[in-house]
Each structure stands twice: as C-alpha cells, then as structure tokens.
C-alpha cells in the first residue's frame, strides 16, 4: 500500500540514523548541503551506506528475507534498478504483478527500515537482457538507442508516463522512502555523448516527479565528461582495487561541493560462460569501504545480494568477442545467491558499526539445504517432434532469413528451416558470413544433429544430403548486449547461410514457445518420436520424483550434460553450460518444489550431447567455478569458496 500521509512511514525510518530527527510532515526532505559537503535528511546531517538488490533477480517470496538481512548488516538504504523490458513486454502492455510488483517491493523495503535509491533507467545495464531496454524497440531497425532519436524518446516518454506516477507517492518528501533517483546509467560509457537526450530525460523526470526529489548520475571516472549534466548531482563508481583518492579528486572537477558518493562500490564481479568465477577478497572490500567512510562519503555496495538470472534474462558483453553472462548472479556478494550470509557480510557489518549504529539481535540463519538423487532422466523426444506444439501458429516464410526482432520473438529460441535444392555427395562447407549467427546455431539435416555454429567463431560445418533434404537451424538467443557503445544487438541469422557456393534461400521461421509447452506438458497428448540410438542435438528429457518430508534450498548439478535449459515444475531455472563452465549448478529455491511425497517434475532441453548416464543430482552446496573435466567425485566436494579466482577490477559496466 502506498503511503497516504507523511507520518505513516516516519516511524519506520527512525532507526536509520542516530542523527535523524523527528520531522513535521511538511519538513521531510533529503537535500545536498554544498556548504558542508554532506547530505541533510530532514535537516540533519546524513550519510547513506547502501547495498544493491534487484527485485527482478529474487522471487517475491524471498524479498523480505533478503531485505531483513541487509538491514541487519548495518545498511540504511538499498539501491535497485527498474528494468523496462521486465514491465513492458510489448508496446503498451504493462505488467506489475507477482515478482514484478514494484510497489510491493518498495513496501517491503519500508518494513525493513530501508531508504531507497531508485535507478529507473531507461537503460540500466545490470548485466540484464539488453540492459533493460525492451527488444521490441529493435523492430525499427534504424532506431538509435539512448539518443535523442524521436522514435526512442517517444517510447521512453510513454514508459515513464506509466512508471513515474506509480512511484511519485513513494518519494521521501511525499511520505515514502525514495530519497534519490538516478537519471540514465553510466551514460558516459556509451559513446553517444548526446546532451540533448540527457536534458530531455532530466526535464521528463522533473515534469513527472517535481523539483524536490534529488536527481543524480553515475559514471565511471572515464565517463564523467559525457555522463554528467548540470542540474543533476554527479556521482562515480569504482571498486576496491581502484585509486580512491585519484577518482574522488577527478569527481571534484565535476561536483566541486557536496558529499562524495560512490554509487557502485564493487563487492565482487560478474561471471561469463567460459571464464573463471570472479571473487573479491574480504580484506580488500572492507578496507576500501572503511577508507571511504573515513572521508565522509556515502557508498552503495554493488552487489549486496546478487540473485539469479532465471529464464532467459541474462545479458551479455562484447569485449573483443561476445561474452554471455551466467545464470548465477551470485557476484561473490556479502549475501550469497541462496540468501545466506557470508564472511564478507560480517566483516562489512563490523566496518559499518564503527561509523553508525547497526541493528542488534541475531541474524536469521542460513536456509536449510537438501540433497536428492542422483535421478535418471527419461528421453521424451527430439525438439523437432513437437514443432507443431512449440509453434502452433505455424512458420513465417521469407526468401531470406528474418531476425528474432522482425518476427517478434523476444528471447529464447527460433527454428529456421529450408530444403536442399540439389544432392551433395561430398562433405561441403556450411557457414554464415559476416559473423551472422547471433548467438548459437544448432544445425540438423533430416533431423540428424551436425554440429554448432557460434557467434565470433569462424568454424564451418561440413554437410551432405540429398535433394529435398530438410535443413534445420535452431538459433539460441544467449542474451542481448547489456553494456557498451551499441545496444542494438539483433538476434537470429543476420545473414543468409551459405552451403558450398550457394546462398540458401526460401526460409521458414518457427518462433518457439518452449516455456508454454513445458508449463502445460501434463495436459498434452505428446506425439511419439523414434528414439535415436545415440541421442544428440536438441532433445527433451524429464523425470518426476517425490521429496519425502520437508524441502530445502538446493542446487541442481548436471554432470556430463553439455548445454541447455532447465525447468522445475514448469518454472524456467535458466541456462546450464556444463561443458564450458564455470557454473556447474543451478540454484533451486525451496518454494519451487512440492514437499511430503508430492511429485515434482524436472524437464531438460539438452541442445547438444547427452551423457551415457542421463542423470542429475540436487546438491546442498553450489559449484560456481569448475569444468566438466573434473572427476565427479571431486567436483561434488567443491564449493564456490574453494574454487575462486580473482580477476582485475574494472571501473564500470553496470
């Protein structure tokens, strides 16, 4: 419920600071005191020590638990993004229900005595699909994202005219807990340097939210020139390995007076498929925080609880090559992906307690964990067997292949089909020119798996077939770019494939609704498919199993499997990529499972190769840094704590 009068939230906020005074209803304020380089909350000196938590990466039933642990850690504020694409899946269609209920999350934060620093974008990065921008923007292929392009501004205006009035009652001076709002996100790193765009956003925020709310920007030190704007308070972001004195000195060139603010102090870092799990040492993170607090700076720790990229929501980076972000967003944060306190949390709480009061009482204990299995999965059938169910509307036909965006397929998978126009007796090279596979293509001839083509890889497949042979290419969107100078990351086959010297034409595109099929699987009469002797290529496996007694959080381990997608009782857990790593387990919150003997169902879509024993197991610890080359007896004994490798800190990218 939104606050109706200023007094209703005031009592909740009293424990936030020793210096917080009892304000009258008309004196609630959060402002910059430039004369004394500090913030004032209701007229009293105030400094926030905040942490990032993304409601869209945490199931709603777990919000209160995570927020309570953040408050116990000594934080007096939280910071979070609002992903546009999470709330407006199609133009003019809005969703604020369930885990998308932003107002409910604001209320949970208030109940936990936490102020809010809101970052509504429109672009958020966050290692989230397309940086939070909806992919339907790309249905206008020439659109210039994050600029003053009229098409982009029209879409932004329409979205903010829905979003910002919803949060208006929650502004601090209106009785809510939102003390400040970020405009855009690290705009200086984008490269456009379009000040007209930033001025338009600032004007839109003021028109819809009024003059009292503090608006600010955040950039890495190299992005301050193009990311800051007069009238918006300038803040910076950096991690424990960076030179704090040098960066804050640079910040003073853009914001000579007022409090120093690090809006993203990195407690850890993200993971990419194919690279080591990133960690940051407890000593480095705590030392950096203490040094900033000694300067009187306000700090937000990114992340304090990372959560999970469920479903298809992970983003991607392009650092010389395309890098897809893992399903786990554990981030080596003070609160683990499963919501458990880590040694980093207790060390940070000790630092915070030197500068401000922290709540008394015991921290809620770690959630109970459980182990189940191993379970042997059963072959359901090849993906092609269910094509009529996966694409009930039938294919879209075109001479040349069309992108996901052109056929309104936002995420997931699309099947491309054509037929060989002549017999090919010898193995003949097959490829897609100009790096035109976005992002992975699983190639089949007459239903037989031939191999994979991957973005940024120059590999070719060698195909044979008779005239009229069916050529199927299942293309996977591995997540749109979420950071960098170009967010227009189109998916699918961007160029027509070539077989030998022949450009292939006459395509059928099947946008697949796999989640719908899995969710309602038990209602359907499934067609029979002849089981291949050695199953390979995109294939469904499943297993029903009971859990006797109560359930606990657990981690799904898929030893020997290659790459694919997993559903538990119809819920899309996300991607696994056992062969590439580093992530080897998927977090399964206990509320997804049925207890006391009720049947649960796990469904896998394995895209490449199945192990000789198609088994999975639920573990009581995560494995976030490993590869499938480790022996199973060894891999089960490892955890993220024992398999961590630090990497150089990067200044920005969130």
UniProtKB/Swiss-Prot annotation:
Q: Highest taxon of the source? A: Eukaryota
Q: What is its EC number?
A: 3.2.1.-
Against InterPro entries, the record matches this protein to: B-gal_1-like, BetaGal1-like_ABD1, BetaGal_gal-bd, Galactose-bd-like_sf, Gly_Hdrlase_35_cat, Glycoside_Hdrlase_35, Glycoside_hydrolase_SF
Any one annotated GO CC term: extracellular region
Positions annotated as glycosylated:
97, 243
Q: Which Pfam families match?
A: BetaGal_ABD_1 (PF21317), BetaGal_gal-bd (PF21467), Glyco_hydro_35 (PF01301)
Q: What class of enzyme is it?
A: hydrolase
Q: What is the protein name stated in its UniProt record? A: Beta-galactosidase-1-like protein
Query: Lineage from the top down?
Result: Eukaryota, Metazoa, Chordata, Craniata, Vertebrata
